[in-house]
Amino acid sequence: MYLSHLTVADFRSYRWADLELTPGSTVLLGANGVGKTNLVEAIGYLGAQQSHRVSSDAQLVRFGRDRARIAGRVHRGSRTVALKVEILPGRSNRVAINRGASVRAKEGLGILRTVVFAPEDLSLVTGEPGGRRRLLDQLMVQLRPALGEAAADYERVLRQRNALLKSGRGSRRWGPEEDATLAVWDEHLCAAGARLLHGRLHVLRLLARPLQEMYAALTNGSKAAAYAYESTVPLARGTHAEVPAVADLATDMRRTLEAQREEERARALTLVGPHRDELALFLGPAPARGYASHGETWSLALALRMAAYDVLVADDPDPDARPVLILDDVFAELDAARRRRLAALVHRAEQVIVTAAALEDVPEELTAHRVLIRQDAEGSEAVAAAAPVEGDIREPRREGGADG
């Protein structure tokens, strides 16, 4: 698949931008700070309705506006789909397909599949566990969009359960009524948590071999990459040739919650569940976090994203379904050998979008099509322009000020 056109309005620093794209490789070229990353973030969001950079949609809307809009024309073989997403922080996104009426947001998932690698992905190796959990959950939803509801249900129930625990902290009012209410939330938490755990473990089982192969390809096989899932739910721990059943995971989670009841009351916090879990990464026998060199960290983070790409390709073997691959400011950080190896790995994608500040950083075979991104005299960002996507987003009238 590929994206032939992208239009954004009030997204990040962009008041309005319109970009024509082609199959094959495209380099978005421009100085640091002109908005290259904002454009590829918009492409990723159009497909997943999630940013690869931030967890809050509010940060995606241009300052002073109440919504942002992204539209694109997606091609999969002979089929073309016009997809539009309106980002409304604090509310559900509005999604339209082929200029039709708005549909449920989840119906827009899967039309455009993307895999994005960006410098922020170093935190997948060096950062806190939340980033690695997010990686698993994003891939899980791309594979099975319906599981997005399980993740949302889990977060909602977790907030309610924590609120109940906090309401009884240090209070003598905790009694049979509170116990009964907590038991109800336990059931909801275990039901949603078990589905989320099952989805994550399924993703990890699919990732294991591609992760090893991609890291070996990027580093010439210097060390073996591996993982272990460290869970507060004992049945979910380790690596799994077979994923435990949802019912078994729910039973084990319920049992563990009961064992932690007094500690949870004392701390007014839910201590058991997928929100507390960790994906531990290893290079050889050593944990990657804290032990990997800078080059190894880059290679492992890249291998994680490229392995995710392989998982999506295997999920739908139709060549026309291969995700769009986005490499955001990657090549400047790689030595010549790693650049060559990465360039050799991306050829399977029908479309590769690369951002760079200097063209010489990008392997020549990936520079077939170039788009210059700049800032005009007024400070607003400008890109190569073409006709809007089916008229979905029109350039707004200027309002007296330029955007930085």
Curated annotation (Swiss-Prot):
ATP binds at residues 30-37. The keyword Nucleotide-binding applies. GO terms for molecular function: ATP binding; single-stranded DNA binding. The keyword Lyase does not apply. Residues 391-404 have a biased composition (Basic and acidic residues). Transmembrane segments: none annotated. One of its GO terms (cellular component) is cytoplasm. Keywords: ATP-binding, Cytoplasm, DNA damage, DNA repair, DNA replication, DNA-binding, Nucleotide-binding, SOS response. GO terms for biological process: DNA replication; DNA synthesis involved in DNA repair; double-strand break repair; SOS response. Residues 379-404 are annotated as: Disordered. It is found in: Cytoplasm. Its main location: cytoplasm. Pfam families: SMC_N (PF02463). Residues 380-390 have a biased composition (Low complexity). The RecF protein is involved in DNA metabolism; it is required for DNA replication and normal SOS inducibility. RecF binds preferentially to single-stranded, linear DNA. It also seems to bind ATP. Belongs to the RecF family. This is DNA replication and repair protein RecF. It comes from Micrococcus luteus (strain ATCC 4698 / DSM 20030 / JCM 1464 / CCM 169 / CCUG 5858 / IAM 1056 / NBRC 3333 / NCIMB 9278 / NCTC 2665 / VKM Ac-2230).
